[in-house]
Structures are given as C-alpha cells and as structure tokens.
Amino acid sequence: MPFADRVKVNFDHPDSMDTPLLAENVRQLRAGQAIERPTYDYANFQRLKGTVRIEPRAAIIVEGILIFESKALRELLDIKIFVDTDPDLRFIRRLVRDIRDRGRTTQMVVDQYIKTVRPMHLEFVEPSKRYADVIIPEGGHNDVGIDLVIQKIKSLVPRPTDS
C-alpha cells in the first residue's frame, strides 16, 4: 500500500490490528513454542519483512491499548491489567513520542488525536477497562498497585528448582 494511503488508515481502530495473529502467537507461547513476532515501522505506517524470535517463558506479558477488545485474546490471558493514565498525560506522551521518534509535526499529532485517537479511545479502550482484573490508576506510578501485581505474577510463575 502506498505511503499516502497508509497515512489515512485509522491505526487506533481494532480492525487495524492483526489480532488473530497475536492470539495465535500467545497460544503458541503458552504451548511452549517459539514464535516469530512481526516488526513494525511506526514512522512509515507499515509492517516490515523481518521478525523477532520470541522464546516461550514462564510469564508472558502482552501489552497494548486494544488487547482487551478481542474476547479470543482476553481468554488467553491469566491476568488482565489496565494501566489508567490521565488523558492529558497520554496526549503529552504521544506528542513528544511522535515528534521525536516518528517525524511528525505538532499539528499532525493534534489532528490525529482529534480525528482518531481520542474517539477510538472513548469507543474501544476506555470501555475495555471492564474486562480488566486489575486497574492501576496514576499511569503506573501507583507503587501499591504495582507491588500487588508483581506478587500475583510471582505466585503464578513456577520457582526454579535447585539441582
């Protein structure tokens, strides 16, 4: 797809994600199989040809703002955590990241935020909080919440045995 067309895609809508592939990758990792994770060029809005090999581990962390939108994916997750961040802080982080890392202008970021980011957040991301087992407020700066999550993960991950 030409760059001019890729720029027009709403990447904040769940349909823009390859959720079936992500779900299959999670299934494979849970089954003890390595996967080849696609790589993306966010500055140019495209999936690259190369992949990154991911080996299975005792704990698998899947992150993304739209992961709770898919029931099939939710069913593969043992713990679902939603990190709730103030909207102003989310916008500032996006503005800084997109200018610094993706070559965007301030106006481009503002336009995208108004046109797609905020509406999609309100339609898909915010309502998906209801599927979370844990909601951590303060954008991850909540030490008590984070400590509780760490303890829960440790309780689920088998301890290595001494040989």
PLM features: what roles do these ranges have?
Residues 32-37, 85-90, 107, 141:
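Conserved Switch II/interswitch segment of TRAFAC-class P-loop GTPases
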Residues 48-102, 157:
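ATP-dependent NMP and nucleoside kinases share a basic, alpha-helical "lid"
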Residues 72, 82-83, 88, 104-114, ...:
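Anionic, Ser/Thr-rich low-complexity intrinsically disordered regions
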Residues 22, 90-93, 147:
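Short, charged, surface-exposed secondary-structure boundary motifs
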Residues 28, 34-35, 56, 106-112:
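Short, basic, glycine/proline-bearing loop/turn elements
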Residues 55-56, 96-99, 118-163:
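NTP-dependent small-molecule kinase module
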